Amino acid sequence: GLIASAQAYPGEPMRDPRTMDQVARACAAGGAAGIRAQGLADLALITQHVDVPVIGLWKDGHDGVFITPTLTHAIAVAATGCQIVALDATGRPRPDGLTFAQTVAGLKEARPDVLVMADCGCLDDARAAQDAGADVLGTTLAGYTGERPVTEGPDIELVDQVAAIAEVPLVVEGRVHTPAQAALAMEHGAFAVVVGTAITHPTTITSWFVQALRSR
């Protein structure tokens, strides 16, 4: 099914927990099977107001590991009431010195009721994340960590590779901008597809139309 990602970037007009809560509720009303959101304030509201599973994360910084980068971040995200916590699952150094596997183990010890989504950048990440006990594998970081090219749409080659080894649900995320691309990801083995920008980021959507008109 469809997971709608409701996130706004720092400095943007929609960067407000109440706004993101409304966006998440609107997506759920439209049939989204789940919501992905970031930030403790946003998550605290969204988890109260939607009846679908929420994937929570905490973006801290802009370089290296910044998606729920430490065990402390992960436990705080879990405390907001979300059912799934998303973590950077790459092998890059984490700010607290723990490995991804140690972070998963620590989170599951603290919150055995919460599932872990591994945000992967390549097949090796997915393999290691699955071995570490991740409950969901995501292609979130494909094209952003150096191992994979930045594809025009979702990285279908990586989807095929991960689907072939996955023993847990595979969630395709990253550059899914059309319903056709989402459907293609499902055909290639996705359990669910995350769509963010194309649904919940009007600044970017507007820019697509503006660029198309200017090019004529």
Model-found features: residue ranges?
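Glycine-rich phosphate-binding active-site loops on the catalytic face of alpha/beta enzymes
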Residues: 7-9, 29, 58-61, 80-94, ...
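Catalytic cores of alpha/beta
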Residues: 20, 63-79, 121-135, 168, ...
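Short beta-strand/loop segments at the ligand-binding rim of alpha/beta enzyme cores
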Residues: 1-4, 50-63, 103, 108-121, ...
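Active-site-adjacent beta->alpha loops and helix N-cap segments on the catalytic face
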Residues: 14-17, 35-55, 64-72, 89-107, ...
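Catalytic domains of carbohydrate-active enzymes, especially glycoside hydrolases
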Residues: 23-36, 80
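N-terminal amphipathic alpha-helix/helix-capping segment at the start of soluble metabolic enzymes
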Residues: 1-14
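Short beta-strand segments at enzyme active-site cores
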Residues: 34-39, 43, 55-57, 83-88, ...
